[in-house]
A protein has these predicted regions:
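Short, Lys/Arg-rich, polar N-terminal cytosolic tail immediately upstream
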Residues: 1-13
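A structural signal for multi-pass alpha-helical bundles of membrane permease subunits
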Residues: 11, 15-278
Length: 278
């Protein structure tokens, strides 16, 4: 009996060791590229940050912030209306929203390009900002958030007390929607910040370099083979290591998204979204 217990204990310990080793290898697989990126970027000594890098960084910030503002202004009312009202076409509209979520963003670029050209906004910042604000996933998240029994009872009580629909939405729904609004803003900013294809198509002209967002500007610099020598086109480098330059620019692209995540982590990691993902 004792030997059987010892054998079971040894098997359990061996299983734990194997599990930890596999988990460590799995973690290392994802961690090594990030660690390399950070350490390689420290090999770059910047004598001067060029105008293009700062300009592209500010462009990305403006585009992402404006797109997130449009997304919040459209997703919350749309999700609230679909969740709390019965109207003709409600179910088809919800199904259409879900179907649009499944369409790859790249598949919508050509129609958006033709539409922007038709209204004479091609190469304009609006050709990038407005599509950033069209966020069907945010509409669906808002719908899930408001489509709960607790909100239904709360809204019905407010209406019984004499509140009109605008007062219910403005004074009750909006203040209570901060968790889902934070999630929509975070997801929209990540999607906008990392979007390369849409700005690349909209800013097709060579004289629109000053309107590039950061990922597009950096990618074109790298794709054009300007990664050797002292100048990378956006920064003056005192190093002869092109990988260091590339790592620095990639880190400059990733870092703002990480900052947004850190700022939003108390919402994302604290269970405030349990009402969203039911």
């Amino acid at each position: 009996m004792l030997s059987h217990t010892n054998s079971a204990a040894r098997r359990s310990a061996t299983g734990q060791v194997v599990t930890y080793v596999l988990l460590a290898l799995f973690a290392a697989f994802f961690a090594v590229p990030i660690v390399w990126l950070v350490f390689e970027a420290t090999g770059v000594h910047l004598g001067m940050i060029g105008g293009n890098l700062g300009l592209w960084l500010s462009n990305s910030a403006i585009y992402s912030a404006a797109g997130a503002a449009i997304a919040i202004a459209t997703c919350l009312p749309a999700g609230y209306a679909i969740a709390t009202h019965e109207f003709p076409g409600r179910r088809p509209l919800l199904i259409l929203t879900m179907l649009v979520m499944l369409i790859p963003t790249s598949a919508l670029v050509l129609p958006l390009f033709l539409e922007a050209n038709e209204v004479h906004q091609l190469t304009s910042p609006l050709a990038v900002i407005v599509p950033y604000g069209l966020f069907p996933f945010g509409v669906y998240l808002s719908y899930l958030y408001f489509h709960t029994e607790r909100f239904n009872v709360l809204f019905q009580t407010a209406r019984s007390d004499g509140c009109d629909e605008w007062q219910v939405f403005r004074n009750i729904a909006v203040p209570l929607s901060k968790p889902v609004a934070a999630l929509i803003v975070f997801l929209n900013i990540v999607a906008s910040w990392t979007n390369f294809f849409l700005p690349w198509v909209m800013y097709w002209s060579n004289d629109t370099t000053n309107r590039y967002p950061l990922p597009l500007g950096i990618a074109l610099q790298l794709f054009n083979g300007e990664t050797s020598g002292e100048y990378l086109g956006v920064v003056q480098l005192h190093t002869s290591s092109p990988p260091s330059a590339i790592a620095f620019l990639l880190l400059a692209t990733i870092a703002p998204v990480v900052v947004v995540f850190v700022l939003a982590r108390r919402w994302i990691g604290s269970g405030h979204f349990q009402g969203v993902f039911r």
